[in-house]
Every structure is written in C-alpha cells, then in structure tokens.
From Swiss-Prot:
Its job: Required for accurate and efficient protein synthesis under certain stress conditions. May act as a fidelity factor of the translation reaction, by catalyzing a one-codon backward translocation of tRNAs on improperly translocated ribosomes. Back-translocation proceeds from a post-translocation (POST) complex to a pre-translocation (PRE) complex, thus giving elongation factor G a second chance to translocate the tRNAs correctly. Binds to ribosomes in a GTP-dependent manner.
Protein name per Swiss-Prot or TrEMBL: Elongation factor 4
The enzyme's E.C. designation: 3.6.5.n1
Organism: Synechococcus sp. (strain CC9902)
HAMAP family attached to this UniProt entry: GUFP (MF_03138), LepA (MF_00071)
Entries under Pfam families matching the protein: EFG_C, GTP_EFTU, GTP_EFTU_D2, LepA_C
Binding locations of GTP: D19, H20, G21, K22, S23, T24, N136, K137, I138, D139
Amino acid sequence: MTDAPVSRIRNFCIIAHIDHGKSTLADRLLQDTGTVANRDMQEQFLDNMELERERGITIKLQAARMNYTAADGEQYVLNLIDTPGHVDFSYEVSRSLLACEGALLVVDASQGVEAQTLANVYLALENDLEIIPVLNKIDLPGADPDRIKEEVEAIIGLDCSNAIYCSAKTGLGVPEILQAVVDRVPAPADAVEEPTKALIFDSYYDPYRGVIVYFRVMSGRISCKDKVLLMASKKTYELDEIGIMAPNERKVEELHAGEVGYLAASIKAVADARVGDTITLFNAPADEELPGYAEAKPMVFCGLFPTEADQYPDLREALHKLQLSDAALKFEPETSSAMGFGFRCGFLGLLHMEIVQERLEREYDLDLIVTAPSVIYNVNMVDGSEELVDNPATLPDPQKRESIEEPYVRMEIFAPNDYNGALMGLCQERRGEYIDMKYITKDRVTLIYELPLAEVVTDFFDQMKTRTQGYASMEYHLIGYRKNQLVRLDVLINGDRADPLTTIVHQDKAYNVGKALVDKLKELIPRQQFKIPLQASIGSRIIASTSISAIRKDVLAKCYGGDISRKKKLLKKQAKGKKRMKAMGKVDVPQEAFMAVLKLND
C-alpha cells in the first residue's frame, strides 16, 4: 500500500442514471488499476447485495481505493465513492458527494441525459465538484456521441469539448478516464495539521464487529489507538481498527486529511453513527461540525403485517436488524382490526419501500401483507392545533378538523416529444398543475408540473413508463404543503371497516375511486358461503356499493321427488345457518385485495 501525500490523492464519484453503465465502469476502473485481480472479478463488483445485482441498481454506497501510476510516473491514490442513482436515494448521493472533489458524469451515448442524472449533477455543482463528462456505450449500434455531447451542453451547460468517449463493457477509453481523474480532479485541501474532522458518508452493520463506518478525513488525522467523539450524537468510542477499502477491507495504522477509510468501534446501531455526522478526537475535539447534513425524512408510509400472527416477533426483530443498516427506515407498532398486529413503516420513496419489503421476505423468510402507501398530511384542527397524519385510518373526524394540507412536489419529466400528449394527460388525471414545457433538443422535451405527492406514490412511475413505452424519466422534489378539499374514503367489507383499504382522496374523485375500489375488491375476494356486501363510505354516507354473491350448496340433492314440506324444511335450515354464518363469519381477504388501491387503473 502506498502512503500518498495529500497532493497525490483524488476522491471522485460516478453520477449516472439507472442503466447507463455506472457499475460496469466502476468494475473496469478496479480492473485497470489492478485493484481487483481478473480471477476475482465479478460483474457489478461494488454492488454487494444480491438484490442490487438482480435489479441492476445500486442501493448501499460502496467505496474503493485504487493505486494508479499516472503518465508522469507518479503513484496516485484514487478513491472511488460509489453512489446510488435512484431518486429515492438522493440523500445517500448528497452525502457521498460531500466526500469528493470530482465526479464522472456518465451518460449513455444512445439514450442521452435523463432526469435523475440531472438532479445529481445539480447536487454536484452545488458542492463545487469538478465534473468530467463521459459518454458511455459508444460501441452500441444506436450510439450518437456527438449529438449527446451537444445535448449535455444544452441541458446542463457543461463544456463537453474534452468529454471522454468510452465503452465500459469493452474497456475502451478507460485509461483516458483514469488519467483525466488525475489531471482534472483537484487534490483535497492539505489540512493535516488542523483539528481532526471526518465525515461519515456510509455505514453498514456487521453482526460480529458492530457498525462499520465509512468516512472521509476532511482535516487532521485519525489513528487506530484514538478515542473518537461523534459530534451530532455526542457519543464517544474507543477505536478497534481503522483501514482502507481496497475494495476489501485492509487494516492500517493511521489515515490523514484527504483519505477515505473505514472504522470499527463496537458501535451497536447505525443510528448511533449517523451518516453526515462528524467524527473528531475526544481529547482534541474540533470547534464545529461539518455543515450541510439533514436527517433523512420518510416521505412514504405503509403498514407491514405478518400473514401469520405468530410471526410478529420475527418481523419486529427483522425490522430492528434492517434499521441497523438502513437509518432512513422508521417504524412503530400498529394494530388493525382486520390484520392484527403489525408495524407502520416510513420510507424515502416507493423503491425504498419495495426494497425493504423484498429484503424482509428474502433475508428473513417472512410472509408479509403490505398496505397501500400513503404520505404525511398536515391537519388543521378546529381548536387551532395542528396534527400530522401518516395513516389515513387515523384521520380525525370531519367535525374536529378545519382543513387538510397535503405535500406537493415539483416534477420534471424528460421524454421524446411524441409522448407529450400522453404525459400531459397523465399529469392532468393526477391533479397536476402545468408550470412549463421546454424543448431541450428538437425531439426531446422537459415537462414541469406541480402535483400532490399522494398521486405520485401510488403508480405514477409505472403509468408514465407504460404510456411512453419506457422512454420517459422523471425527477421530483418536495416544495411544501397546500390546502385541498380532501376526504377520508373508508371501505366496509361485510359491514366492518377494513383499515388497510382506507385512503384519503380529493372530494371530486371520491365517487370514482370508491366505485372502482369496490368493483376491484369484488374481483379479488373469493366467494364465501354467505353474501358479502362491499361498500365505500365517506363518514356515514355510503357512496358506492356492490356485493359478492354466496356460493350455494344444493341441500335438495338427496330429495328425490316427493314431499314439498321436506324440501322447505331443508331450505329453511340452510337459510338459518347462512344467517348465523353471516353474523359470525369472518371474510378471508387475500393480500392482492389490500393492494387494490394501487391497481385501480389496470
């Protein structure tokens, strides 16, 4: 391992939209610098989670240190800090950008700039990162790097005269990228003699050593014998070991300003070593922490219930374990008359929710029922107080509340302009407010809309992809709360309110949603031995209803001809039994029915 001076360290990350080849490029960089031997190489080397490889996305951040001999013959240390590309994980991106001085902007030479790339580029520009444009996949038959270069200049305003053409798949252009990182990314500030400050940009839970913290030393130095203080959580720890990721962990004695490494200190939970927190020395603490950290706030909520009641303790333990490695996941216990005991969980977005659900089922072997996602509403009460509601079933009664405010987002959609009409129609259906439309190039357009987050979290993304044959991409950010005429829509199954199906909808859409919901439930709930009424109600007013007819057993099969009174007696007995069954019977509602709220447009 080379102990490089600060002037020969380069910290950089890769910014790219999903599927533009970021993980493949990271693989090539590791291979070209000899960091990973060819025999150990596997695709998407930095994506450790099985789920990441399968979905082709990066969820958890990884980091890797590479030794590189540049054209001037000097040995440089390049620290690649991998970032997620999905909009849900923008908080993970923002903190990893803080640990870098430069970024490779990877754009697919056949597809061009996408919305999420743009969002991350703006984050990088805010952090004053040196951006190196890289046009990837130039070996594809549909690639047109010159046109895409103009597009990047037009949309982002970056000078692309020295953009690098490459193909991460074949390795073409990779040496030029490594040299460009050395030449164009500035070295970290030489602050070795200043008080020690290090930024935590990621952490994961190791069952044997506790939380492993990934950090970048901003100033000063940290050695493996130090006692450290985490400035935001005010906790102190004796270090067990520090080291570098090359890309597998390797112990070292000391790390100084500009270097990226990991530490283990028997930390119990990820929440104790929060991402964005500042590490300093206990004996010689820094005066102030590093700026710009905001705690991740959940945007989307849903209920998680085990299908078997006796799995509740297992679910609780699994959530606690997941929270050890995912500080953005929030949960609290919840009970429901229809579903029993479970948890109300908060997520960063729909993808985060899906991933958590999939990890619970896959890694902890649980069968889960997931209720439809909702957002946080701000309810202004008659007595002047305010209440935050993340579960539609707990919305206060109409007579107690004055108004309801819901979160709004500003959304930018990128698409070929053939799909303009389809996208505008979709945004209009979702109560969107048209703001602007810009032509980026002659055949690509950006639509800007403001719309309620609740309309986005259900299936907006799927619908957008369906209506544009997969060509559109979107990016959104929260812009605040607005008052709207919202009502709580309850669903009654056999006269009992089914909490998981309760939703908050706009007054004008209530009838249509209620009607669609009961019709969908009629398809999904299996017939029982008694008639099941399905109703949608606002308060005590039923606005839509239908019913599932009973399965009828032929009790007269044994009566051959003969006495009518015998038949009447049997039919009467059957009717009596059905009446009792209706009063006592519990309707078995399958998981698909609880997701019906999401599938109303199918």
